[in-house]
Swiss-Prot record:
Biased composition (Low complexity): 352-381
Taxonomy of the source species: Eukaryota, Metazoa, Chordata, Craniata, Vertebrata
Modified residues (Phosphoserine): S155, S276, S326, S368
Name of the protein described by the UniProt record: Leucine-rich repeat-containing protein 41
Subunit-level organization: Part of an E3 ubiquitin-protein ligase complex with Elongin BC (ELOB and ELOC), RBX1 and CUL5. Component of a probable ECS(LRRC41) complex which contains CUL5, RNF7/RBX2, Elongin BC and LRRC41. Interacts with CUL5, RNF7, ELOB and ELOC.
LRR repeat residue numbers: 482-502, 513-525, 526-550, 608-632, 638-661, 696-723, 726-747
Domain notes: The Elongin BC complex binding domain is also known as BC-box with the consensus [APST]-L-x(3)-C-x(3)-[AILV].
Pathway named in the protein's UniProt entry: Protein modification; protein ubiquitination
Ranges of compositional bias, category Basic residues: 382-396
Species, as recorded: Mus musculus
Disulfide bond entries: none
Amino acid sequence: MAAPEAWRARSCWFCEVAAATTMEATSREAAPAKSSASGPSAPPALFELCGRAVSAHMGVLESGVWALPGPILQSILPLLNIYYLERIEETALKKGLSTQAIWRRLWDELMKTRPSSLESVTCWRAKFMEAFFSHVLRGTIDVSSDKRLCDQRFSPLLHSSRHVRQLTICNMLQGATELVAEPNRRVLETLASSLHTLKFRHLLFSDVAAQQSLRQLLHQLIHHGAVSQVSLYSWPVPESALFILILTMSAGFWQPGPGSLPCRLCGEASRGRAPSRDEGSLLLGSRRPRRDAAERCAAALMATRRKSEVKQMPRAVPPTRVTRRSTQESLAIGGTDSKLYLPATSYEASGTKQPSAPAAASASSSTSSKRAPASSASQPKPLKRFKRAAGKKGPRTRQGSGAESEDLYDFVFIVAGEKEDGEEMEIGEVACGALDGSDPSCLGLPALEASQRFRSISTLELFTVPLSTEAALTLCHLLSSWVSLESLTLSYNGLGSNIFRLLDSLRALSGQAGCRLRALHLSDLFSPLPILELTRAIVRALPLLRVLSIRVDHPSQRDNPAVPENAGPPGHIVGDEEIPENCLEQLEMGFPRGAQPAPLLCSVLKASGSLQQLSLDSATFASPQDFGLVLQTLKEHNLSLKRLSFHDMNLADCQSEVLFLLKNLTLQEITFSFCRLFEKRPVQFLPEMVAAMKGNSTLKGLRLPGNRLGNAGLLALADVFSEDSSSSLCQLDISSNCIKPDGLLEFAKRLERWGRGAFGHLRLFQNWLDQDAVTAREAIRRLRATCHVVSDSWDSTQAFADYVSTM
């Protein structure tokens, strides 16, 4: 009896609130109603008035509202603002109520964007709160404009921060300064525990203050937080200092910026054990002997540069004397004791303006690319950095030894020059022998093997971020001991000959105890190595790799007869020795134009006995026999293979090899995407293919998009599902195959005649079904009784016009 009594008490309490609200509303509307010329408007419903009053006084009535019966609470939920709606979620679930429809409506009305069709939204509350946090942080939404977003009792950032799993920082690092401000300390602490992915999009040049804020933000979110993935997208002209800052912080290195306060969390972790200054330097690997070696190397670089400048100067101008101080200032490295500076300067002597520190650092990347082998000579020139406006030299931001020693370049000391007027300068002739990147001390890069680190991320992604030699050296040096890294994506970064340094660093990483790298995704326009040789080199360097995706859009320079033979890679990168056994489970390769040597691909496949998924995109072989050699290798050495995909390959002359594949490989899924499979001898080949499939009991998925199957081919394919077939096919993709409605209807009737049960999914995208809409609808209706049909409303006439216009 206790439960009904409690329910009755809550109902009475709600009625009292309703009565009080009605009286208050009536008294407020009485005066305006008398003066209204058109007469009083219809009063709101009693329940709506009550709900509004409860929503407006939730600060006092919240506990009582939570205890209301489910039917009453369900009517109040849409009237609450987002803060109380979020807080009441757990109580609503206990009463069997869902708020997902309310959050979806809020998304449609306030965000006014449609989620991607590829995105499956499992929780609209979390999605709304995450987007709301980002909009408030960037200032793109005004919370005071809507009463559902405005409540003086709550902080929009703090209340929504615990739902943020992914945060994107754009342009001029908007939001970084706000997050590290003292009023938002609790917001940052919440983000540190909830945020998993940090993305940077379309970054532009930023000032010193913004970079300092980003430094503190990354330290909190990565070193003391839960961020495990950092992704950079579309950064056409990366700023060297900012890029290196993001990389080093992601790798677990931390050094306070000039004038910044010590980290509170670091102090709590040390429990009173404050590391000495020497200990802090050792942590970051900035040891004096290595700094001196770097300075000597830098002096030699600058001396060579000055010699070339003197040759181009008028004779009246005296030659420039390179001093230790001029070298340090031009490189903008900071972090050295002021006692090491000598009084002489070279910029004033030559009449050249002294660049500011960031400008010098960012401009230094292009000349350092001369360290590359000759095979990179025809690579596209890297994008030049933006230069400071004329007449604006900018103040020096590193003053005194104390501030300089805390600069990021105290950790990563970058030595490079500036490429001017197409001038060629070979760094290897200057100092430190041949600067091949193998000796980090010559470049001022610290030895990380013995260094201690903070927490680092496990996934790093760089999409369309051109890497200068300076940035590539930094990345490779960090990768060599980044044992926590599990997945690395480098997409269209213009690596060029820096790919050799990357392979060296990956080989060094693989030799580290506890190396976790299991997935590598690499794609670029050009490569100094043919793609198969590059694949062999990666597999040798990373034998524990599980997933490898590699794509090169254009042929390598070694495939060009005009490139001299001595422009090849180092001998330890590419060799003829046999590849050792590896752990590859998934291999995806996108080939440039030109025939590929089948033996090289077979050598990779033979060493990949655990391979389960293989995808070849745009692969071309010299003859059908070479393609058959690859299939024979798969049959003999890749017994665990389950999925095989061919895309954009001309298999019109490889019909016997395709039949061998269907008869001899025990695959679960095969894809022939735009492979011109039925271009030749379709009348003879289709029955042979159908017969092979009818005897294949392991194949469950067949994808044939873009193969000109047509109505005749579709009807022949229907025989796979006949009564005498032992096929287990349950997924069929016949998109883009010139199928007409009458052929699809006949296909549906044959499936009905044979009485096969539901076989799964049928994909019909981009076929000629719009030529007879009535017949197409009837065919799809019949098919849906047998399988799940996925189709679209495709305009075939417009598509044909587009095709003709491009001929």
